[in-house]
Amino acid sequence: MIVLDTHVLVWADADDHKLGRKARILIDRLWPLGQVTVSAISFWEIGMLQARRRLRLPVSVAEWRDALLSAGVVELPLDGAMAVRALDLAGLHDDPADRFIAATALLHGAALVTADDRLLDWGGALKRYDARE
């Protein structure tokens, strides 16, 4: 199972060239198996980016989310265990969405697919794939 970082979800949906060949193959292989997941916090993060005009979706965040879930992306909900785990990620930067996404991957035993160098370089015990490869 893999957890897509927010920007990777956007790239995968848009078939963006920023998504590397290896990452695309991994996503395409796991998608039909129901093993491509996303933290629920990613939809909040997308909404915040859209509100700040840093991202434009052709539809509302709710419609975009529904379309992705209908297409087979699995949403992993937030819960108290994740909130506590997100607090306990020594050395990880303070971005709350990144902390929740990392905690989600850790608690589900999943690998994180990201292009965020801060997450890729973090020393924690999280399996990661560089989405640019």
What are these regions (language model features)?
Residues 49:
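ABC-type ATPase nucleotide-binding domain
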